[in-house]
Amino acid sequence: MTDIDIDTIINRSLHALENSEYSEFDLLLNQLSYLIKQSVNSNNKTASKEQITRILDYTPNNFNQVESLRLYRGLLILVRNFAPLLDIDLFPIVANSFEKFLKALNQTSEWTDRIIEVYWQILANFQRNEFTEVANEFFGQWESKYKWKDIPVSVMSPVIHFLFRQFNTQDPHITNENLLSLLKLFETNHVMNAVYEIFTMIDFADTNNIGHDNKMFIHLLYDIITHESFQKWIEQQNEEETITKWLSLTSVIVQTKTDWNNYELIALLSWNGSLFMKYAPLINSNCNTTVNGEDDFGYVEDDISAITAIFAELSQFNATKQYFEHYEDLLPKLIFVFKWIHDNIEPITIKSSKIEEVGRYSSVKTNIITILSYLSYDSFQFQEKIRELGGLSLVLSNCIIDNNNPFIKEQAIVCLKYLLQKNPKNQQFVADLEAKKVVDDQVLSEVGYQVEVIDGKVAVKRK
Protein backbone atom coordinates (compact mmCIF):
# COMPACT_ATOMS: atom_id res chain seq x y z
CA MET A 1 0.00 0.00 0.00
CA THR A 2 1.67 3.23 -1.17
CA ASP A 3 1.19 6.79 0.06
CA ILE A 4 -0.42 7.63 -3.30
CA ASP A 5 -2.94 4.84 -2.91
CA ILE A 6 -3.92 6.03 0.56
CA ASP A 7 -4.06 9.72 -0.33
CA THR A 8 -5.91 9.14 -3.58
CA ILE A 9 -8.63 7.02 -2.05
CA ILE A 10 -9.05 9.34 0.94
CA ASN A 11 -9.19 12.38 -1.36
CA ARG A 12 -11.78 10.77 -3.62
CA SER A 13 -13.91 9.67 -0.67
CA LEU A 14 -13.83 13.11 0.96
CA HIS A 15 -14.62 14.76 -2.37
CA ALA A 16 -17.68 12.54 -2.75
CA LEU A 17 -18.81 13.34 0.79
CA GLU A 18 -18.28 17.09 0.52
CA ASN A 19 -20.11 17.28 -2.81
CA SER A 20 -22.75 14.62 -2.13
CA GLU A 21 -21.59 12.90 -5.31
CA TYR A 22 -22.07 9.13 -5.05
CA SER A 23 -21.99 7.96 -8.67
CA GLU A 24 -18.82 5.98 -7.86
CA PHE A 25 -20.04 4.88 -4.44
CA ASP A 26 -19.50 1.14 -4.96
CA LEU A 27 -15.99 1.69 -6.33
CA LEU A 28 -15.02 3.98 -3.45
CA LEU A 29 -16.40 1.57 -0.88
CA ASN A 30 -14.45 -1.31 -2.43
CA GLN A 31 -11.26 0.76 -2.44
CA LEU A 32 -11.79 1.72 1.19
CA SER A 33 -12.38 -1.92 2.07
CA TYR A 34 -9.06 -2.79 0.45
CA LEU A 35 -7.27 -0.07 2.42
CA ILE A 36 -8.91 -1.21 5.64
CA LYS A 37 -7.72 -4.79 5.12
CA GLN A 38 -4.21 -3.57 4.36
CA SER A 39 -4.17 -1.24 7.37
CA VAL A 40 -4.48 -4.18 9.75
CA ASN A 41 -0.87 -5.04 8.88
CA SER A 42 1.27 -2.92 11.20
CA ASN A 43 4.16 -3.04 8.71
CA ASN A 44 2.25 -0.84 6.30
CA LYS A 45 2.41 2.92 6.48
CA THR A 46 -0.40 4.94 7.99
CA ALA A 47 -2.10 7.90 6.41
CA SER A 48 -0.44 11.24 7.04
CA LYS A 49 -1.43 13.37 10.01
CA GLU A 50 -2.85 15.93 7.59
CA GLN A 51 -5.08 13.36 5.91
CA ILE A 52 -6.29 11.98 9.25
CA THR A 53 -7.13 15.53 10.30
CA ARG A 54 -9.06 16.11 7.06
CA ILE A 55 -11.16 13.01 7.73
CA LEU A 56 -11.88 14.12 11.29
CA ASP A 57 -12.73 17.66 10.22
CA TYR A 58 -15.61 16.38 8.13
CA THR A 59 -19.07 16.02 9.70
CA PRO A 60 -22.02 14.44 7.87
CA ASN A 61 -24.84 16.90 7.23
CA ASN A 62 -27.47 14.54 5.88
CA PHE A 63 -28.28 11.64 8.18
CA ASN A 64 -30.83 10.29 5.71
CA GLN A 65 -28.14 9.69 3.10
CA VAL A 66 -27.01 6.08 3.67
CA GLU A 67 -24.18 6.35 1.10
CA SER A 68 -22.75 9.31 3.00
CA LEU A 69 -22.87 7.50 6.33
CA ARG A 70 -21.36 4.29 4.98
CA LEU A 71 -18.55 6.11 3.21
CA TYR A 72 -17.72 8.20 6.25
CA ARG A 73 -17.78 5.12 8.46
CA GLY A 74 -15.27 3.49 6.10
CA LEU A 75 -12.90 6.44 6.53
CA LEU A 76 -13.32 6.26 10.31
CA ILE A 77 -12.54 2.53 10.33
CA LEU A 78 -9.32 3.41 8.53
CA VAL A 79 -8.50 5.93 11.28
CA ARG A 80 -9.40 3.31 13.89
CA ASN A 81 -6.89 0.85 12.47
CA PHE A 82 -4.20 3.52 12.30
CA ALA A 83 -4.96 4.85 15.82
CA PRO A 84 -2.38 2.79 17.79
CA LEU A 85 0.41 4.29 15.65
CA LEU A 86 -0.89 7.84 15.40
CA ASP A 87 0.58 10.89 17.09
CA ILE A 88 -1.22 11.28 20.43
CA ASP A 89 -1.70 14.97 19.62
CA LEU A 90 -4.50 13.79 17.34
CA PHE A 91 -6.48 12.54 20.35
CA PRO A 92 -8.18 15.91 21.07
CA ILE A 93 -9.00 16.21 17.37
CA VAL A 94 -10.76 12.83 17.46
CA ALA A 95 -12.68 13.83 20.59
CA ASN A 96 -13.69 17.12 18.99
CA SER A 97 -14.76 15.36 15.79
CA PHE A 98 -16.89 12.94 17.81
CA GLU A 99 -18.47 15.86 19.69
CA LYS A 100 -19.34 17.63 16.43
CA PHE A 101 -20.92 14.46 15.10
CA LEU A 102 -23.04 14.03 18.24
CA LYS A 103 -24.18 17.66 18.17
CA ALA A 104 -25.11 17.46 14.49
CA LEU A 105 -26.89 14.13 14.88
CA ASN A 106 -30.62 14.84 14.60
CA GLN A 107 -31.86 11.32 13.95
CA THR A 108 -30.51 7.85 14.58
CA SER A 109 -30.30 4.78 12.40
CA GLU A 110 -28.34 1.57 12.05
CA TRP A 111 -25.53 3.44 10.31
CA THR A 112 -25.30 6.35 12.78
CA ASP A 113 -25.07 3.76 15.57
CA ARG A 114 -22.27 2.01 13.70
CA ILE A 115 -20.41 5.30 13.26
CA ILE A 116 -20.69 5.98 17.00
CA GLU A 117 -19.28 2.51 17.68
CA VAL A 118 -16.28 3.19 15.41
CA TYR A 119 -15.62 6.56 17.05
CA TRP A 120 -15.39 4.86 20.44
CA GLN A 121 -13.11 2.23 18.93
CA ILE A 122 -10.79 4.98 17.67
CA LEU A 123 -10.57 6.46 21.17
CA ALA A 124 -9.99 3.01 22.67
CA ASN A 125 -7.18 2.25 20.19
CA PHE A 126 -5.22 5.41 20.94
CA GLN A 127 -2.09 5.11 23.02
CA ARG A 128 -2.29 6.08 26.68
CA ASN A 129 -1.99 9.85 26.90
CA GLU A 130 -2.34 12.80 29.25
CA PHE A 131 -5.44 14.40 27.75
CA THR A 132 -7.54 13.68 30.85
CA GLU A 133 -9.44 16.96 30.78
CA VAL A 134 -10.22 16.51 27.08
CA ALA A 135 -11.64 13.07 27.84
CA ASN A 136 -13.65 14.46 30.75
CA GLU A 137 -15.16 17.20 28.59
CA PHE A 138 -16.07 14.68 25.92
CA PHE A 139 -17.74 12.38 28.46
CA GLY A 140 -19.78 15.39 29.55
CA GLN A 141 -20.96 15.91 25.98
CA TRP A 142 -21.81 12.23 25.71
CA GLU A 143 -23.84 12.28 28.94
CA SER A 144 -25.85 15.24 27.69
CA LYS A 145 -27.13 13.11 24.80
CA TYR A 146 -27.14 9.51 26.03
CA LYS A 147 -27.84 7.49 29.16
CA TRP A 148 -25.26 4.82 29.84
CA LYS A 149 -27.88 2.19 30.63
CA ASP A 150 -29.23 2.53 27.08
CA ILE A 151 -25.88 1.93 25.38
CA PRO A 152 -25.64 -1.33 23.37
CA VAL A 153 -22.94 -3.87 24.21
CA SER A 154 -21.16 -3.17 20.93
CA VAL A 155 -20.52 0.40 22.11
CA MET A 156 -19.93 -0.41 25.78
CA SER A 157 -16.99 -2.68 24.96
CA PRO A 158 -14.76 0.05 23.43
CA VAL A 159 -15.83 2.46 26.20
CA ILE A 160 -14.51 0.02 28.80
CA HIS A 161 -11.33 -0.58 26.79
CA PHE A 162 -10.79 3.17 26.54
CA LEU A 163 -11.21 3.70 30.30
CA PHE A 164 -8.95 0.77 31.13
CA ARG A 165 -6.18 1.81 28.73
CA GLN A 166 -6.17 5.40 29.92
CA PHE A 167 -6.58 4.94 33.68
CA ASN A 168 -5.54 1.47 34.85
CA THR A 169 -2.47 1.10 37.05
CA GLN A 170 0.29 -0.34 34.89
CA ASP A 171 2.94 -0.61 37.61
CA PRO A 172 1.83 -0.75 41.29
CA HIS A 173 5.21 0.65 42.34
CA ILE A 174 4.81 3.83 40.27
CA THR A 175 2.17 6.50 40.81
CA ASN A 176 -0.65 6.24 38.29
CA GLU A 177 -0.37 9.79 36.93
CA ASN A 178 -3.39 9.52 34.64
CA LEU A 179 -5.63 8.43 37.49
CA LEU A 180 -4.07 11.12 39.67
CA SER A 181 -5.03 13.74 37.09
CA LEU A 182 -8.55 12.35 36.89
CA LEU A 183 -8.98 12.43 40.67
CA LYS A 184 -7.92 16.06 40.75
CA LEU A 185 -11.16 16.91 38.95
CA PHE A 186 -13.27 17.36 42.07
CA GLU A 187 -16.24 19.00 40.37
CA THR A 188 -18.09 17.88 37.23
CA ASN A 189 -16.04 14.72 36.89
CA HIS A 190 -17.93 13.14 34.02
CA VAL A 191 -15.51 10.23 33.67
CA MET A 192 -15.99 9.16 37.28
CA ASN A 193 -19.74 9.47 36.85
CA ALA A 194 -19.53 7.22 33.78
CA VAL A 195 -17.46 4.69 35.72
CA TYR A 196 -20.13 4.49 38.41
CA GLU A 197 -22.95 4.18 35.88
CA ILE A 198 -21.17 1.36 34.06
CA PHE A 199 -20.64 -0.40 37.40
CA THR A 200 -24.40 -0.41 38.02
CA MET A 201 -24.90 -2.32 34.77
CA ILE A 202 -22.84 -5.34 35.88
CA ASP A 203 -24.77 -8.28 37.34
CA PHE A 204 -22.72 -9.22 40.40
CA ALA A 205 -25.31 -11.79 41.43
CA ASP A 206 -24.04 -14.04 38.63
CA THR A 207 -20.26 -13.77 39.02
CA ASN A 208 -19.64 -16.94 37.02
CA ASN A 209 -20.90 -15.24 33.88
CA ILE A 210 -19.12 -11.90 34.13
CA GLY A 211 -17.49 -11.38 30.75
CA HIS A 212 -13.93 -10.37 29.89
CA ASP A 213 -14.71 -6.67 29.44
CA ASN A 214 -16.49 -6.44 32.78
CA LYS A 215 -13.66 -8.29 34.53
CA MET A 216 -11.25 -5.77 33.07
CA PHE A 217 -13.51 -2.95 34.23
CA ILE A 218 -13.65 -4.38 37.77
CA HIS A 219 -9.85 -4.35 37.88
CA LEU A 220 -9.99 -0.67 36.95
CA LEU A 221 -12.34 -0.15 39.91
CA TYR A 222 -9.74 -1.79 42.16
CA ASP A 223 -7.22 0.78 40.95
CA ILE A 224 -9.58 3.71 41.47
CA ILE A 225 -10.79 2.98 45.01
CA THR A 226 -7.27 2.17 46.24
CA HIS A 227 -5.49 5.09 44.56
CA GLU A 228 -3.66 7.37 46.97
CA SER A 229 -5.71 10.37 45.80
CA PHE A 230 -9.14 8.77 45.97
CA GLN A 231 -9.61 9.77 49.62
CA LYS A 232 -9.11 13.44 48.83
CA TRP A 233 -11.40 13.18 45.82
CA ILE A 234 -14.29 11.62 47.71
CA GLU A 235 -13.89 13.92 50.70
CA GLN A 236 -14.08 16.94 48.39
CA GLN A 237 -17.42 15.93 46.90
CA ASN A 238 -20.12 18.51 47.58
CA GLU A 239 -23.01 16.19 46.79
CA GLU A 240 -23.63 13.55 49.43
CA GLU A 241 -25.26 11.41 46.75
CA THR A 242 -21.89 10.99 45.03
CA ILE A 243 -20.25 9.78 48.25
CA THR A 244 -23.12 7.37 48.90
CA LYS A 245 -22.83 5.96 45.37
CA TRP A 246 -19.11 5.28 45.68
CA LEU A 247 -19.51 3.73 49.11
CA SER A 248 -22.19 1.45 47.69
CA LEU A 249 -19.89 0.55 44.79
CA THR A 250 -16.99 -0.21 47.12
CA SER A 251 -19.12 -2.38 49.41
CA VAL A 252 -19.79 -4.61 46.40
CA ILE A 253 -16.31 -4.51 44.86
CA VAL A 254 -14.44 -5.48 48.05
CA GLN A 255 -16.30 -8.79 47.97
CA THR A 256 -14.88 -9.68 44.55
CA LYS A 257 -11.24 -9.90 45.59
CA THR A 258 -9.47 -11.90 48.28
CA ASP A 259 -5.84 -10.94 47.71
CA TRP A 260 -5.74 -7.24 48.60
CA ASN A 261 -2.19 -6.19 49.39
CA ASN A 262 -1.34 -4.00 52.37
CA TYR A 263 -1.07 -0.81 50.30
CA GLU A 264 -4.53 -1.36 48.86
CA LEU A 265 -5.96 -2.21 52.28
CA ILE A 266 -4.53 0.88 53.93
CA ALA A 267 -5.94 3.05 51.14
CA LEU A 268 -9.39 1.50 51.51
CA LEU A 269 -9.36 1.64 55.29
CA SER A 270 -8.12 5.22 55.35
CA TRP A 271 -10.86 6.84 53.32
CA ASN A 272 -13.59 4.65 54.78
CA GLY A 273 -12.33 5.33 58.29
CA SER A 274 -12.27 9.06 57.61
CA LEU A 275 -15.86 9.03 56.34
CA PHE A 276 -17.01 6.86 59.24
CA MET A 277 -15.58 9.34 61.75
CA LYS A 278 -17.49 12.07 59.89
CA TYR A 279 -20.85 10.30 59.78
CA ALA A 280 -20.92 8.41 63.10
CA PRO A 281 -21.63 11.56 65.19
CA LEU A 282 -24.51 12.39 62.83
CA ILE A 283 -26.40 9.20 63.61
CA ASN A 284 -28.54 11.07 66.16
CA SER A 285 -29.40 13.63 63.49
CA ASN A 286 -30.64 10.83 61.29
CA CYS A 287 -33.93 10.99 63.18
CA ASN A 288 -34.42 14.68 62.50
CA THR A 289 -36.58 16.07 59.72
CA THR A 290 -36.61 19.25 57.72
CA VAL A 291 -39.42 21.77 57.83
CA ASN A 292 -40.97 19.94 54.89
CA GLY A 293 -41.02 16.72 56.85
CA GLU A 294 -38.28 15.17 54.75
CA ASP A 295 -35.31 13.38 56.27
CA ASP A 296 -32.38 15.80 56.15
CA PHE A 297 -29.77 13.18 57.01
CA GLY A 298 -31.05 10.17 55.12
CA TYR A 299 -27.63 9.62 53.58
CA VAL A 300 -26.14 8.88 57.02
CA GLU A 301 -27.88 5.52 57.24
CA ASP A 302 -26.81 4.50 53.74
CA ASP A 303 -23.23 5.59 54.30
CA ILE A 304 -22.78 3.99 57.72
CA SER A 305 -24.35 0.79 56.40
CA ALA A 306 -21.94 0.68 53.47
CA ILE A 307 -18.85 1.55 55.53
CA THR A 308 -19.53 -1.11 58.17
CA ALA A 309 -20.08 -3.64 55.38
CA ILE A 310 -16.71 -2.68 53.88
CA PHE A 311 -14.96 -2.90 57.26
CA ALA A 312 -16.60 -6.27 57.93
CA GLU A 313 -15.35 -7.64 54.61
CA LEU A 314 -11.81 -6.33 55.18
CA SER A 315 -11.61 -7.39 58.84
CA GLN A 316 -10.23 -10.78 57.82
CA PHE A 317 -6.91 -9.09 56.97
CA ASN A 318 -4.29 -8.38 59.60
CA ALA A 319 -3.83 -4.86 58.20
CA THR A 320 -7.34 -4.01 59.40
CA LYS A 321 -6.51 -4.98 62.96
CA GLN A 322 -3.34 -2.89 62.76
CA TYR A 323 -5.36 0.03 61.40
CA PHE A 324 -7.74 -0.12 64.38
CA GLU A 325 -4.74 -0.30 66.72
CA HIS A 326 -3.22 2.82 65.17
CA TYR A 327 -6.43 4.89 64.97
CA GLU A 328 -7.62 4.53 68.54
CA ASP A 329 -10.71 6.73 68.09
CA LEU A 330 -12.24 4.39 65.54
CA LEU A 331 -13.25 1.52 67.84
CA PRO A 332 -15.08 3.78 70.35
CA LYS A 333 -17.03 5.34 67.47
CA LEU A 334 -17.88 1.90 66.12
CA ILE A 335 -19.27 0.77 69.47
CA PHE A 336 -21.07 4.12 69.85
CA VAL A 337 -22.93 3.39 66.61
CA PHE A 338 -23.56 -0.18 67.78
CA LYS A 339 -25.11 1.07 71.03
CA TRP A 340 -27.20 3.76 69.33
CA ILE A 341 -28.75 1.25 66.93
CA HIS A 342 -29.28 -1.25 69.75
CA ASP A 343 -31.02 1.35 71.91
CA ASN A 344 -33.09 3.00 69.19
CA ILE A 345 -34.08 0.35 66.67
CA GLU A 346 -36.20 -2.59 67.73
CA PRO A 347 -35.20 -6.03 66.47
CA ILE A 348 -37.56 -7.54 63.92
CA THR A 349 -38.71 -10.94 65.12
CA ILE A 350 -40.89 -13.53 63.45
CA LYS A 351 -43.81 -12.52 65.64
CA SER A 352 -43.45 -8.78 65.14
CA SER A 353 -42.47 -8.66 61.48
CA LYS A 354 -44.45 -8.39 58.32
CA ILE A 355 -43.44 -10.40 55.26
CA GLU A 356 -40.19 -9.04 53.78
CA GLU A 357 -40.13 -6.21 56.32
CA VAL A 358 -36.79 -4.41 56.50
CA GLY A 359 -35.97 -1.99 59.29
CA ARG A 360 -33.54 0.86 59.46
CA TYR A 361 -29.79 0.22 59.59
CA SER A 362 -30.35 -3.27 58.26
CA SER A 363 -27.36 -5.61 58.85
CA VAL A 364 -25.25 -2.87 60.49
CA LYS A 365 -25.18 -4.60 63.89
CA THR A 366 -24.20 -7.87 62.24
CA ASN A 367 -21.42 -6.08 60.37
CA ILE A 368 -20.12 -4.48 63.55
CA ILE A 369 -20.18 -7.78 65.45
CA THR A 370 -18.24 -9.35 62.57
CA ILE A 371 -15.62 -6.61 62.89
CA LEU A 372 -15.42 -7.11 66.67
CA SER A 373 -15.02 -10.86 66.14
CA TYR A 374 -11.96 -10.44 63.96
CA LEU A 375 -10.48 -7.78 66.24
CA SER A 376 -10.92 -9.83 69.43
CA TYR A 377 -9.70 -13.11 67.96
CA ASP A 378 -6.45 -14.02 69.72
CA SER A 379 -6.05 -10.42 70.93
CA PHE A 380 -6.19 -9.72 74.67
CA GLN A 381 -5.77 -6.01 73.94
CA PHE A 382 -8.94 -5.79 71.87
CA GLN A 383 -10.84 -8.10 74.23
CA GLU A 384 -10.18 -5.61 77.01
CA LYS A 385 -10.98 -2.52 74.95
CA ILE A 386 -14.25 -3.94 73.69
CA ARG A 387 -15.41 -4.76 77.23
CA GLU A 388 -14.33 -1.38 78.58
CA LEU A 389 -16.22 0.42 75.81
CA GLY A 390 -19.40 -1.54 76.47
CA GLY A 391 -19.05 -3.79 73.46
CA LEU A 392 -19.17 -7.09 75.37
CA SER A 393 -22.57 -6.35 76.92
CA LEU A 394 -23.88 -5.29 73.50
CA VAL A 395 -22.69 -8.54 71.93
CA LEU A 396 -24.38 -10.49 74.72
CA SER A 397 -27.61 -8.58 74.18
CA ASN A 398 -27.61 -9.47 70.50
CA CYS A 399 -27.42 -13.23 70.79
CA ILE A 400 -30.97 -13.21 69.49
CA ILE A 401 -32.82 -13.67 66.23
CA ASP A 402 -33.30 -10.35 64.42
CA ASN A 403 -34.64 -10.42 60.88
CA ASN A 404 -33.23 -6.94 60.36
CA ASN A 405 -29.77 -8.37 60.98
CA PRO A 406 -29.53 -11.80 59.34
CA PHE A 407 -27.34 -14.32 61.19
CA ILE A 408 -26.69 -11.86 64.02
CA LYS A 409 -27.22 -14.54 66.67
CA GLU A 410 -24.72 -16.88 65.06
CA GLN A 411 -22.16 -14.10 64.59
CA ALA A 412 -22.67 -12.81 68.14
CA ILE A 413 -22.04 -16.28 69.56
CA VAL A 414 -18.78 -16.53 67.60
CA CYS A 415 -17.77 -13.08 68.79
CA LEU A 416 -18.62 -13.93 72.40
CA LYS A 417 -16.45 -17.02 72.18
CA TYR A 418 -13.47 -14.92 71.06
CA LEU A 419 -14.11 -12.27 73.72
CA LEU A 420 -14.13 -14.85 76.53
CA GLN A 421 -11.14 -16.85 75.33
CA LYS A 422 -8.33 -16.72 77.95
CA ASN A 423 -9.78 -13.53 79.43
CA PRO A 424 -10.75 -13.88 83.13
CA LYS A 425 -12.17 -10.35 83.37
CA ASN A 426 -14.50 -10.89 80.45
CA GLN A 427 -15.54 -14.26 81.83
CA GLN A 428 -16.29 -12.73 85.22
CA PHE A 429 -18.18 -9.87 83.56
CA VAL A 430 -20.46 -12.42 81.90
CA ALA A 431 -20.79 -14.40 85.14
CA ASP A 432 -21.94 -11.29 87.00
CA LEU A 433 -24.56 -10.62 84.35
CA GLU A 434 -25.69 -14.24 84.48
CA ALA A 435 -26.21 -13.94 88.23
CA LYS A 436 -28.64 -11.13 87.46
CA LYS A 437 -30.35 -13.41 84.91
CA VAL A 438 -29.31 -11.09 82.10
CA VAL A 439 -27.46 -13.79 80.17
CA ASP A 440 -29.14 -16.83 78.62
CA ASP A 441 -27.50 -20.04 79.88
CA GLN A 442 -28.10 -21.58 76.47
CA VAL A 443 -25.93 -18.91 74.86
CA LEU A 444 -23.06 -19.67 77.23
CA SER A 445 -23.44 -23.34 76.52
CA GLU A 446 -23.19 -22.72 72.79
CA VAL A 447 -19.83 -20.98 73.22
CA GLY A 448 -18.51 -23.78 75.43
CA TYR A 449 -18.96 -22.29 78.90
CA GLN A 450 -21.07 -23.06 81.94
CA VAL A 451 -21.96 -21.15 85.08
CA GLU A 452 -20.69 -22.40 88.45
CA VAL A 453 -21.12 -21.10 92.00
CA ILE A 454 -17.84 -21.37 93.91
CA ASP A 455 -17.66 -20.19 97.55
CA GLY A 456 -20.83 -18.20 97.03
CA LYS A 457 -19.50 -16.48 93.90
CA VAL A 458 -20.77 -16.97 90.39
CA ALA A 459 -18.10 -17.84 87.83
CA VAL A 460 -17.97 -18.84 84.17
CA LYS A 461 -15.89 -21.91 83.39
CA ARG A 462 -15.06 -23.89 80.28
CA LYS A 463 -17.22 -26.97 79.94
UniProtKB/Swiss-Prot annotation:
SUPFAM superfamilies: ARM repeat. Its main location: cytoplasm. Keywords: Cell cycle, Cell division, Cytoplasm. It comes from the Eukaryota. InterPro entries: ARM-like (IPR011989), ARM-type_fold (IPR016024), Ataxin-10/CTR86_families (IPR051374), Ataxin-10_domain (IPR019156). One of its GO terms (cellular component) is cytosol. One of its GO terms (biological process) is cell division. It is found in: Cytoplasm. The keyword Cell division applies. PANTHER family: ATAXIN-10. Belongs to the ataxin-10 family. May play a role in the regulation of cytokinesis. This is Ataxin-10 homolog. It comes from Candida albicans (strain SC5314 / ATCC MYA-2876).
